[in-house]
Amino acid sequence: MSNKNDSFVVFDRVQKSYDGLSLVVKDLNLHIKKGEFLTMLGPSGSGKTTCLLMLAGFETATHGEILLDGKPINNIPPHKRGIGMVFQNYALFPHMTVGENLSFPLEVRKISKHDREKKVMQALEMVQMSDFINRKPAQLSGGQQQRIALARSLVFNPDLVLMDEPLGALDKQLREHMQYEIKNLHKQLGVTVVYVTHDQSEALTMSDRVAVFNDGQIQQLSTPDGLYERPENAFVAQFIGENNKLAGQIKSVNNREVIVKTSQNMEVKALKVNCGDVGTDTTLSIRPERIHLNSKYINKVDATIKQLIYHGDHIRCLIKIDKDNDFIVKIPNSNIKSTLKIGEKIPISWDTMDCHALDA
């Protein structure tokens, strides 16, 4: 987590309730560094968008304080916070040209006509849209409209830009392209970005750090690789990427490792991450690409192939390891496809360090 001394955005014990009874955000403490790209990731209703709206000034915190560059902003209206915003629906004025859309936030800030024209052109050049300055939004594609919305959020040189699921309406290929464009702009400008999405691939691709939300709380705050490789609880392991899980009970504990007995009496050696003592229930988490089609590693079992699905760069293999559990295995695409057959029995194994013992 960021040191408090270099924090640009701070949520200090922030709570939010809409009905005065239930909390949709629960005691949120979060420090975001200047120039950082932080993503709030989580399912619908997890509290992530409410946090963004409180930071923007469109919602008020029920309790706690939000600070921007060291100053409390709870009572400052949205238009005086100096924050750029990008929405999923673009929110462009349909009766204005592209140039007029970008000029509007500068007019509100009493920028001179000469400086407005200069800043508008600079912003359009950043997103490679200067040739479209005289077009109306209806004459643009979805991707072009999103670029204009992005340029408008940056045109007045804000220190902080908030993005609320900005790529949700785009098709897959364009969405992936825009992810890289936004990340490159962030690097180029050094602006602080707080990004909200439920799409894990967006979060992992673009972010410096990701805050995973569920039930109004941050479940884990980490770098993208930290979330994927070292999930701290069963929710994060299941929400980030694909995950195989086994339920069991802890049989023994030895420093950082545990032996877990599953419901089918299989004993599994795992890394102790977030679990209790001997006799308590736990959930084991193993990523599909960490399972090997051999008996080389300490955790091994014979499995039966149920399904083979071709994915281009890899083959997705669904296997049954016992009467209660199926696993997914990702196999790099090679000639192995022709050697595997549905119904075939194969040995599989995985390393202790790739198997995490988490909360039940």
What does each model-identified segment do?
Residues 56:
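Helix-to-loop junction immediately C-terminal to a conserved catalytic motif
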Residues 41-43:
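The feature captures the beta-strand-to-loop junction immediately N-terminal to the Walker
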Residues 78-84, 88, 92-235:
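ABC ATPase nucleotide-binding domains
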Residues 64-72:
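Conserved ABC transporter NBD signature motif
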Residues 243, 253-360:
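Non-catalytic connector elements of ABC transporters
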Residues 62-65, 115, 215, 247:
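Conserved coupling/switch loops of ABC nucleotide-binding domains, chiefly the family-specific signature
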Residues 2-11, 16-27, 76-77:
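A short, flexible loop at the N-terminus of ABC-type nucleotide-binding domains that lies
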